[in-house]
From Swiss-Prot:
Keywords, ordered alphabetically: ATP-binding, Kinase, Nucleotide-binding, Phosphoprotein, Transferase
Pathway stated in the Swiss-Prot or TrEMBL entry: Sulfur metabolism; hydrogen sulfide biosynthesis; sulfite from sulfate: step 2/3
Encoding gene (name): cysC
Top-level taxon of the source organism: Archaea
Gene Ontology CC entries for this record: cytoplasm
Name of the featured protein: Probable adenylyl-sulfate kinase
List of residues binding ATP: 17-24
Family matches, as InterPro entries: APS_kinase, P-loop_NTPase, Sulf_AdTrans/APS_kinase
NCBIfam families in the cross-refs: apsK, PRK03846.1, PRK05541.1
The protein's role, per its UniProt record: Catalyzes the synthesis of activated sulfate.
Family the entry assigns: Belongs to the APS kinase family.
Organismal lineage: Archaea, Thermoproteota, Thermoprotei, Desulfurococcales, Desulfurococcaceae
Reactions the enzyme catalyzes: adenosine 5'-phosphosulfate + ATP = 3'-phosphoadenylyl sulfate + ADP + H(+)
């Protein structure tokens, strides 16, 4: 039986950035570190959400807002029960991220907005799912960074530059911030 460290209230760590910037990689590595220490951790990411709780959701502004509202409530419910919730979502609009923050913080749960930064040129080069290639050919509508805007956070708690720094460096930096908040 696994023994968990109990924290009264969890925390929501919200990673935002262009598709392919490294959000999910950072989220899963951070989760591994925290789980090894005995914390209860859940990673919520866009691929998982769009095949489960938001199956069939599209990519218009309205659909994205509705989708992220669902995720915010799931994160809030988990965090109020002592879970560290690491969310990895493009969440391209300032309006959406502010909505998520309000939903989480009205329960008194700490919310960390983390900007996973990579230039458009770099994420096009990486293109792990081939989505930029399709978007540039006009095969995908409302694709963030190509046919739909990404509004970078104005005052994130942390900026993780995945072009200039290694994954290990970025995870370590974020880990230190999370530990400072939960301890």
């Amino acid at each position: 039986m696994t023994t968990y460290k109990c924290i009264e209230k969890g925390i929501v760590v919200w990673l935002t950035g262009l598709p392919g910037s490294g959000k999910t990689t950072i989220a899963t590595r951070l989760a591994d570190l925290l789980q090894k220490e005995g914390y209860r951790v859940e990673v919520l990411d866009g691929d998982w959400a769009r095949t489960t709780v938001s199956e069939g959701a599209g990519f218009t502004r309205e659909e994205r807002l509705r989708h992220l509202k669902r995720i915010a409530w799931i994160a809030r419910l988990l965090a109020r029960n002592g879970v560290i919730v690491i969310c990895s979502f493009v969440s391209p609009y300032k309006q959406a991220r502010n909505m998520v923050r309000r939903i989480v913080e009205e329960e008194g749960i700490p919310f960390l907005e983390i900007y996973v930064k990579a230039s458009l040129e770099e994420v096009i080069r990486r293109d792990p799912k081939g989505l930029y290639k399709k978007a540039l050919k006009g095969e995908l509508e409302n694709f963030t960074g190509i046919t739909d805007p990404y509004e970078p956070p104005e005052n994130p708690q942390l900026v993780l530059d995945t072009e200039s720094n290694t994954i290990e460096h970025n995870v370590s930096y974020l880990y230190s911030l999370v530990k400072a908040v939960i301890e």
